[in-house]
């Protein structure tokens, strides 16, 4: 597809029928880390304007821990996982109560969805979440999504809501993604450094790291940082969804298509949610090591991974689980969904289709990873 101009991207955002808005905890809190109701109300006001004009909004909101640690008597955000999860359990209800009150002033109902990374890794849970959000939007409700901090394991979690928001944008077939943070745009260097300047438009985010040096977040509240926001924008771009990154105070102008923050152009036509899920959300459970011939075929695109070209299988996984496909040097080539359990694969390695059919039966004469379930990385 031809890369759209900044003006075209901004117009597309303004005309978007469905928008996902992500706001981080640092944009909803006071310097002390406690929830700032005034900031929350201002954000809701901007969203309500779009909603009252007939647009659909999905709000991906952090802030459960920030809302909970004050009422529990903590002076600062807890650092150990168990206390964070307990605090999130208390804070999520308080956060939703504030949102319900704020949106209620505009006659808008809200619905809560708490999602873990594992929910996006399992096709059934993914479909259920997509179906629920579609129905909420059909009913005129604003879904408010957050990672389920109270249940998410430390090993498998988003750790921020940036990437989650991009997955949600693809899930609901959004027309735009707005990433709200505590800085007003992407800069060529940390904004505090001399000579740093704002980047108003990124036509191809895959080339971004050649022109931008990203510093760490200056916020002491959020856990995302700029890197995960860029990853979210990249996920949106490769899904065919334009994105805007800006400060929460600019939410209204960003939604209206004004030239605030940094706009990211989509880099390809909208792809399938399934392929985005495989590429970004699925957590690989194992590794299949391809020989040089198979690696070349995989790199060429649209080739299935056959047992004849696989040297080794590592990990414990079931058929349908996501796996890495590596070359012999250990480089990741692709992600895919395994066609067989890890226990079945060793007997298949190095055998062509005719041999597999003769020795093991027809049910083993299929690719280890079918090309429809394989995505290059």
UniProtKB/Swiss-Prot annotation:
The protein's enzyme class: transferase
Domain of life the protein comes from: Bacteria
Protein location: Cytoplasm
Binding site for ATP: 22, 181-182, 223-229
Chief location: cytoplasm
Residue ranges annotated for the PUA domain, each copy included: 285-363
GO MF annotations in UniProt: ATP binding; glutamate 5-kinase activity; RNA binding
Any one GO BP annotation for this protein: L-proline biosynthetic process
EC number(s) per entry: 2.7.2.11
CDD domains reported for this sequence: AAK_G5K_ProB (cd04242), PUA_G5K (cd21157)
Family statement: Belongs to the glutamate 5-kinase family.
Protein name: Glutamate 5-kinase
């Amino acid at each position: 597809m031809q890369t759209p101009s900044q003006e075209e991207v901004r117009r597309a955002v303004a005309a978007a029928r469905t928008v996902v808005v992500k706001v981080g905890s640092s944009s909803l809190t006071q310097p002390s880390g406690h929830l700032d109701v005034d900031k929350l109300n201002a954000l809701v006001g901007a969203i309500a304007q779009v909603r009252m004009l007939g647009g659909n909004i999905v709000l991906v909101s952090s802030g459960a821990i920030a809302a909970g640690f004050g009422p529990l008597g903590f002076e600062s955000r807890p650092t150990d996982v168990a206390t964070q999860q307990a605090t999130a359990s208390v804070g999520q209800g308080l956060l939703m109560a504030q949102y319900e009150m704020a949106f209620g002033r505009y006659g808008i109902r809200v619905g809560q969805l708490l999602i873990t990374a594992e929910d996006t890794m399992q096709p059934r849970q993914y479909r259920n979440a997509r179906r629920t959000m579609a129905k909420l939007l059909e009913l005129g409700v604003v879904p408010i999504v957050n990672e389920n901090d109270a249940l998410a394991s430390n090993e498998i979690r988003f750790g921020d809501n940036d990437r989650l928001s991009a997955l949600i944008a693809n899930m609901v077939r959004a027309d735009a993604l707005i990433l709200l943070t505590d800085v007003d745009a992407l800069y060529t260097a940390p904004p505090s450094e001399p000579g740093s300047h704002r980047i108003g438009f990124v036509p191809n985010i895959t080339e971004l790291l050649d022109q931008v040096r990203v510093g760490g977040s200056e916020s002491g509240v959020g856990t995302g940082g700029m890197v995960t926001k860029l990853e979210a924008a990249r996920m949106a771009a490769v899904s065919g969804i334009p994105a805007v990154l800006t400060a929460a105070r600019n939410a209204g102008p960003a939604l209206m298509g004004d030239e605030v923050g940094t706009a990211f152009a989509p880099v390809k036509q909208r792809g399938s949610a399934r392929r985005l899920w495989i590429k970004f959300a699925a957590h690989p459970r194992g590794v299949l090591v391809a020989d040089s011939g198979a690696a070349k075929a995989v790199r060429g695109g649209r080739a299935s991974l056959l047992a004849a070209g696989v040297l080794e299988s590592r990990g414990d996984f079931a058929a349908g689980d996501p796996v890495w496909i590596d070359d012999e040097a250990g480089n990741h080539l692709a992600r895919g969904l395994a066609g067989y359990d890890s226990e079945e694969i060793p007997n298949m390695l190095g055998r062509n289709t005719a041999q597999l059919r003769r020795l093991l039966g027809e049910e083993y004469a299929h690719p280890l990873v079918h090309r429809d379930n394989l995505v290059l990385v």
